[in-house]
């Protein structure tokens, strides 16, 4: 779930804040690092028996580091990715679970204002409705990633959050398993998020996101609510854009009221646009000739769950499909660039002075922004979709 994706996209960097006197820097001998974590936990006030029991079975997991560095799924474009993740079978199962858990979803919508389709989509994508929640030992994963010097400031606090869950009986360092980045349960939440937003949805006295769908869904809704989800508001809507639209106006970094988009010729493909005064952005995940959406403020909350534009667009679209929206119009988009071509484009953009982040062949927000700027400079349609034509022009 949310910080999970930071594991995919944050760059290596210094810790976000000063370490305590007991903290040990990342790297070095793993055993020495764990000793430092023990000392820090004791300094934080954790009982000695809890600290000893938590770290007793912790081991470094090289498979976690390999998984952290191999995330090719995020190189897929929206059409490819969405067709891989969304099938009629998955859609049918989502609707079946919506019916079976109708009372739970009614309660969630009343308490937190998060629509059932949103949660069902995350539940489907994260663990296939709880079927596969990951088989990495969570304590090992978190300590391994905290020891790794790419993002220690992200994962170190999660170690202590997991320890707190252990102390209250909601985590087992020897048996709790999940994703490689430390997420737990049917909607894949990190320990700190469980501490902050975990809810006992089934009333058994524990927050058990692995075995209780009610706990998992209610906790996920509470987290989205705390992140700013607006009850009763849309998140993503398929639209039809006029051929003469100024493509430089598109992109998530540019918003204007729905009424202004309507005045520019933007229409809903199904139903009506959102309220006239609602801020929105035109999202073209594969350029002006591909699918088109209007992204509302709630869509931005998705990026707190996962920072891949392809993933969140697919999840938001699937949420709409679950509740009756039609299949999107794929259009006829330019095929774009392969990984090697994307890396060449990023290198060229960087040479021109653009900050594209890591040269990794992945189309991220900074690369899209640089592409749109160069398209406008060269007199090309500035839809932020990188093409061979742009690469050749550069």
At which residue positions do the language-model features occur?
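A general alpha-helix detector
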Residues: 33-40, 104, 141, 345-348, ...
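Bacterial N-terminal signal peptides
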Residues: 4-17
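Catalytic glycan-binding domains that act on GlcNAc-containing polysaccharides
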Residues: 46-277, 290-293, 301-319, 326-339, ...
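Short acidic, glycine/serine/threonine-rich helix-capping segments at coil-helix boundaries
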Residues: 335-342, 350-394
């Amino acid at each position: 779930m949310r910080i999970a994706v930071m594991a995919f996209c944050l760059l290596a960097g210094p810790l976000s804040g000063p370490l305590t006197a007991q903290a040990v820097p990342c790297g070095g001998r793993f055993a020495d690092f764990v000793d430092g974590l023990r000392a820090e936990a004791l300094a934080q006030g954790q009982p000695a028996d809890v600290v000893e029991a938590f770290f007793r079975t912790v081991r470094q997991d090289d498979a976690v580091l390999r998984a952290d560095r191999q995330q090719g799924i995020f190189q897929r474009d929206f059409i490819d990715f969405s067709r891989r993740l969304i099938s009629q079978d998955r859609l049918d199962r989502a609707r079946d679970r919506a019916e079976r858990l109708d009372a739970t979803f009614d309660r969630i919508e009343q308490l937190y204002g998060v629509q059932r389709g949103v949660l069902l989509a995350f539940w489907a994508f994260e663990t296939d409705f709880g079927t596969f929640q990951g088989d990495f030992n969570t304590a090992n994963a978190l300590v391994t990633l905290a020891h790794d010097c790419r993002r220690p400031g992200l994962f170190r606090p999660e170690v202590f959050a997991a320890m707190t869950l252990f102390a209250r009986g909601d985590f087992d360092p020897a048996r709790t398993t999940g994703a490689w980045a430390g997420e737990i349960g049917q909607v894949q939440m990190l320990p700190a998020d469980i501490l902050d937003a975990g809810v006992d949805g089934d009333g058994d006295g524990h927050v058990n996101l692995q075995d209780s769908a009610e706990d998992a869904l209610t906790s996920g809704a509470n987290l989205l609510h705390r992140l700013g989800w607006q009850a009763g508001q849309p998140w993503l809507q398929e639209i039809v854009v006029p051929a003469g639209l100024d493509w430089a106006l598109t992109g998530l970094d540019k918003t204007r009221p729905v009424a202004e988009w309507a005045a520019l010729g933007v229409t809903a493909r199904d139903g009506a646009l959102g309220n006239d005064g609602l801020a929105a952005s035109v999202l073209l995940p594969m350029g002006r000739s591909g699918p088109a959406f209007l992204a509302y403020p709630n869509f931005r909350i998705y990026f707190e769950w996962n920072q891949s534009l392809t993933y969140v667009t697919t999840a938001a679209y699937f949420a709409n499909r679950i509740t009756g929206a039609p299949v999107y119009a794929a259009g006829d988009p330019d095929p774009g660039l392969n990984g090697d071509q994307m890396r060449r484009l990023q290198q060229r953009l960087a040479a021109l002075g653009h900050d594209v982040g890591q040269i990794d062949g992945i189309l991220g927000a900074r690369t899209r922004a640089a592409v749109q700027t160069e398209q406008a400079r060269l007199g090309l349609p500035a839809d932020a979709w990188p093409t061979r034509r742009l690469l050749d022009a550069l």
